């Protein structure tokens, strides 16, 4: 049985700012772009969250909810430095580390001899060490199943941890909402609910053939996750190459104005996801994807140095006009391709 830990730093960017400037500690603060530039919130501290300020929220909306919000532009070198220190702490316990972003990672401690091999104690010690050496708090999930570790790390935030033992997995899954499973969005959740499927326990009673017919290969993933099956390794060689976000509509759209409105809603989430792995927003390419009512899809992208909404909208409009051919559109997606480390190093040296 594996021992998987998911460590997630608490409001990481904001926490670094509060650590370095204690005057910010008890007031609402957020990291993000200015209202004038139509920016979005990258992260907010807990005092700001009490007012409803959330990640990926337009800055203008955040300031309406919390007029006295202190908005900071971000110090990404400081965040990267802290992230590297945290990664070094992880490496004291295991070499099997899969970073998901600057502020979260999976650790496989199955073979670790630290803390007498107790994953629970290892997670506690890692969190204590992070606080001792960086004055930052982290939350953790400890489970034998990879995807459950990420869910568990959110259960006792902030500055806590949640353990699901092998004996507890089955009972935990019985009542786990399907919307908690990675990949289950609002549209999929609505389709599942229409089938009477709301929890993993419900899916356990469902015929796999029905799920495959309705959802294709994702139906199998859904069935496996609901059984507590996740055989993916914690991949220490994992190098993220792209970041994307997409939306499948409940009904096909036929007008450009509808597509543009969807892009406006998707863009802040793309920006938030990119900021977690690439705070400076430097990229190699960006592009759009459209899937039509006949299930054919098209992607168009081009070289672009930094995430840019206006360019994405222009690319989408060109794709809409030239490739739709009167068909309805059932999915709209935005994505960026990240710079490979060698290319990024050359770019930095060139600057």
Curated annotation (Swiss-Prot):
GO terms for molecular function: damaged DNA binding; DNA-directed DNA polymerase activity; magnesium ion binding. Its main location: cytoplasm. Keywords: Cytoplasm, DNA damage, DNA repair, DNA replication, DNA-binding, DNA-directed DNA polymerase, Magnesium, Metal-binding, Mutator protein, Nucleotidyltransferase, Transferase. CDD domains: PolY_Pol_IV_kappa (cd03586). It is found in: Cytoplasm. SUPFAM superfamilies: DNA/RNA polymerases, Lesion bypass DNA polymerase (Y-family), little finger domain. Residues 4-185 form the UmuC domain. It catalyses: DNA(n) + a 2'-deoxyribonucleoside 5'-triphosphate = DNA(n+1) + diphosphate. GO terms for biological process: DNA-templated DNA replication; error-prone translesion synthesis; SOS response. GO terms for cellular component: cytosol. It comes from the Bacteria. Its EC number is 2.7.7.7. Binds 2 magnesium ions per subunit. Signal peptide: none annotated. Mg(2+) binds at residues 8, 103. InterPro entries: DNA/RNA_pol_sf, DNA_pol_Y-fam_lit_finger_sf, DNA_pol_Y-fam_little_finger, DNA_polymerase-Y, DNApol_IV, IMS_HHH_1, Rev_trsase/Diguanyl_cyclase, UmuC. The active site is at residue 104. The record marks 13 as: Substrate discrimination. Its cofactor is Mg(2+). Monomer. Belongs to the DNA polymerase type-Y family. Poorly processive, error-prone DNA polymerase involved in untargeted mutagenesis. Copies undamaged DNA at stalled replication forks, which arise in vivo from mismatched or misaligned primer ends. These misaligned primers can be extended by PolIV. Exhibits no 3'-5' exonuclease (proofreading) activity. May be involved in translesional synthesis, in conjunction with the beta clamp from PolIII. This is DNA polymerase IV. The gene is dinB.
